[in-house]
Amino acid sequence: MRHPDFPSQLAMTSAWHASLRLRFAARAGRTAMVERRHEGPLRVQKPLYPEGEICHGVVLHPPAGVAGGDRLDIDIAVASGAHAVLATPGATKWYKSLGRDAAQHVRIEVAAGGKLDWLPQENIVFDDARARITTDVVVAPGGSAIGWDAVVLGRQASGERWASGALWLDTRVGDPDRALWIEQSHFDGASPLRGAVAGMDGLHILGTLWAIGPGATQELAEALAEHLPYRADLRAGVTCLAGYGTATAQSMLLLRVLGSDMEAVRHLMIDAWTVLRQPMHGVPARPLRLWST
């Protein structure tokens, strides 16, 4: 019997190419979703306003998983004076690919005076999957953004080891003039680095949180670092990457996490976001309703 989380034969032989374009702007004292275009199975739910003028949206991918050959493109822009919060309702599953790469490309642009919280749930990379996850973030001086990504290698809840396959993580975060952080990582299921102390040390979950804007200071990084764990099953560290070259250059905080339990990693990242939101956006943190369901 086919596992309910495994794609049908049809899903493995066909491919989805889907895109979603979202634009946010300040209108009549609150943030409005002024443009939403989609092709294929990517959608966004009707905007909600649990924080008054801040616009909340939930990005939906009805197939719930990404199979070999699929490509998802998400393009987000936040204008000056607007504040958007975007999340996903569940984990993104990357299925066994039968040799074909699957890809997701997220592009984020925040204007001066704009604010964004990009808070998707984790990616679960199945054994034999080939996943390419690309994120490009450009935040103009005076704008701010907080976002994260987490990856679980293998269906750990089902006892599956990630023994074969490949994962590429390509991330760029910066301002219009320069990148403050560029990551180009390649994970191979059979690589000995996954078990090496200098690699993942046998842990199978990795998370990254970035926060870019005027509030990203060394003092904030040090305050956050005091509460981060460093033990065998959950490790985290934070650094401040300061801008340079001009008086308006952006700075960012970068939090990296390794763990063995997704719930623990998730709670750590939510706690960090809770600490960072006020100094980064000037708005107190309010946990998303999605996180309690």
From Swiss-Prot:
InterPro entries reported for this sequence: UreD
Q: Name one GO cellular component term.
A: cytoplasm
- Superkingdom is Bacteria
Query: Single GO molecular-function term?
Result: nickel cation binding
Q: Where in the cell is it found?
A: Cytoplasm
Per its database record, what is this protein's job? Required for maturation of urease via the functional incorporation of the urease nickel metallocenter.
The record ties this protein, via HAMAP family, to:
UreD
The record's annotation in PANTHER family points to:
UREASE ACCESSORY PROTEIN D
Q: What is this protein called?
A: Urease accessory protein UreD
User: Species lineage, top-down?
Assistant: Bacteria, Pseudomonadati, Pseudomonadota, Betaproteobacteria, Burkholderiales
